[in-house]
Amino acid sequence: MANLFGRTARLQISSTVPAIGGTVTSWIEVTGLRVSFTVKRTLKPDANSASVEVFNLSATSRAGIKRKGVRVILEAGYQDVGLETVIQGDCRLASHEQSGTEWVTRFELLDGGRVLRYGRASTSYAPGTPVSKAVGDLAGKLGLSGGQLAKQLPSLAAKTLNGIVTHGGVGETLDKLLKPQGYSWSIQDGKLQVLKGDSDSTELIPLISTDSGLIGSPKLLTPDKNEGRSLLSFRSLLNARIRPGCLVAVQSKQFSGQFRVESVTHKGDTHGTDWTSEVEAIL
């Protein structure tokens, strides 16, 4: 825990609204200001969300996020350890309010919000086409490639389509391609993630113990009524490496082992008391 001091955060805001599937070429970087946030991330196909407040942004930076759709990357961490991405998302709502001598900028983010709302798929595949190709093509077209997807697609290479025509929204198309194969999907930091059953995302495994930021004791939650699975709930100092789908190694008196993260809520304030990650993981 010795290195988990000196909290720090950084925002990167795109100078323009990128096209669906396009890349950002110019960023406005914000450092050294007070930032507070609540970020909610899950394995569900609904977009992950964040509420962010930034204090005393310059007039130029405020002007840069007046329009919906600008891309925002929120990073947080510790001075001795470095920064990790807490969320990357599209701005769906922004406001600037002057309170006394301070300007407070508030905005709401949705991870993959624009592509899920406006992205469309229209193509056809012949019988025998690997599912991995169809999913990879869609991800590439819509700018969702990257992350852990390259490691996850090979497991779909042996599965083939009977012949399919895709024409509709992104979520509808992914459901059509993946659900029959027993796979689920979500968007994490602007990248498509696909998982089979209770498999994990193959990312590095964060260690959660009293020496690495665990707060209090983990709790065992009542099994989900629909799936009959127990959940382990725990709270730690902010750790942005804890992402839905990854494994965490928990070490405590009551529970020890590796658990797959189902959801995480990161709360932080560089000048306040909040700086935690609240996690639910399956046993």
How would you name each of these model-derived features?
Residues 1-108:
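Assembly/oligomerization scaffold segments
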Residues 37-61, 65, 197-283:
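An acidic/polar, Gly/Ser/Thr-rich interaction patch typically located in mid-to-C-terminal regions
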Residues 50-55, 109, 122-147, 164-188, ...:
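Amphipathic, non-transmembrane alpha-helical segments in extracytoplasmic/periplasmic proteins
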Residues 59-62, 80-81, 115, 145, ...:
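Short beta-strands and strand-coil junctions in structured, solvent-facing domains, enriched
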Residues 63-71, 117-125, 245-251:
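Extended Gly/Ser/Thr-rich low-complexity repeat segments
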Residues 93, 102-116, 148-223:
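Short beta-strand-centered interaction patches in the first periplasmic/extracellular domains
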Residues 95, 113, 265-267:
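A generic structural motif
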Residues 103-120, 273-283:
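Short solvent-exposed strand/turn elements
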